[in-house]
Amino acid sequence: MSAPINGTVEKSYVPGAELWCQEDETAITEPYTYVNSMPGKDVRGRFIEAANHWLHVEPEPLAVICKIVAMLHNASLVIDDIEDNSQLRRGQPVAHKIYGLAQAINSANYVYFLALKEADQLKPYQREGYNSHEIILGALTSVSDFAAQDLLYSVFSDELVNLHRGQGLELVWRDSLRCPTEEQYIDMVNKKTGGLFRLAIKLLTACSSNPSTIDYVPLFNLFGVFFQIRDDLMNLDDNEYEKNKGFAEDLTEGKFSFPVIHGITAQKDNSVLINVLQKRPTTPPLKLHAIHHLRNNTGSFKYTETILNSLETRLRGEIDALGGNPGLLKLVDLLSVRK
């Protein structure tokens, strides 16, 4: 067994974090920081601020919750862009095209754990004696013995599990070219897109200074579904989306989005949409052909708008039933597709 040459070398082989510095931290988080610095509408952050109209969380924990959700969201975008082989994110080249796959993956995964560490800061603000897992953890929890679990970590882990389950299903459908039903799609969206909305409202409820036992999770589940279906429509039928993310990028990704699912289901004997998804088109002609088919042959855009109008009506009704919320109504107005 060879001996170390000197004390410095010997020390460098002793496990520990004493050599870690801010320069290292900056270097490994750079792909995430790149995405995080891109200008966006921060819809989730605005939802959190609006929901606090009901829950009255103090400014310090409110800022932590906003930070956690933003970290998870932007880290997930880095991974999504890799899994979808995207080229643009908010009008800029995606992170993995600049930093490479390996650095981008590691950076995003690292930020997931940094976000979990941020949850430690919420413990002093957790409502004393508030141990109702029916309200906080909801029906999707896998926790069998709440008394033996840490509420904040349970919320965090459950919703990250849901997010990855939803994303996994979407990838399986895409790669196997298997069109889901609308019901399966809604369930997937509730897991994937709804996860961060639920995480936010559950953390807000856990830290609320308002003793109310109202369950706001169903409302935020509805928001998640509404938000994703609208995003699907905008991807195929909106000029602003084209400038920011690319023209009909969902078709290039082979994604079974809500309008596409309707188009396939409406004409089961017509394989045009399946064929387009299989080819993952990167140039306009095939995309324009599919969009024309969805708009004029199957009426899928009109159908999607009808569903969104119905969901919007439900959202407004739920908000009113919960006592009203001007901030949330402004966000519904912002996202509305009503002419």
From Swiss-Prot:
Domain of life of the native organism: Eukaryota
UniProt binding sites for dimethylallyl diphosphate: R89, K192, T193, Q228, N235, K245, K255
Residues given in the record as isopentenyl diphosphate binding sites: K41, R44, H73, R90
Cofactor info, note text: Binds 3 Mg(2+) ions per subunit.
GO terms, biological process: isoprenoid biosynthetic process
Function noted in UniProt: Geranylgeranyl pyrophosphate synthase; part of the gene cluster that mediates the biosynthesis of erinacines, cyathane-xylosides that show unique biological activities, including leishmanicidal activity, stimulating activity for nerve growth-factor synthesis, and agonistic activity toward the kappa opioid receptor. The geranylgeranyl diphosphate (GGPP) synthase eriE catalyzes the first step in erinacines biosynthesis via conversion of farnesyl pyrophosphate and isopentyl pyrophosphate into geranylgeranyl pyrophosphate (GGPP).
Name of this protein: Geranylgeranyl pyrophosphate synthase AN1592
Species the sequence originates in: Hericium erinaceus
Recorded name of the encoding gene: eriE
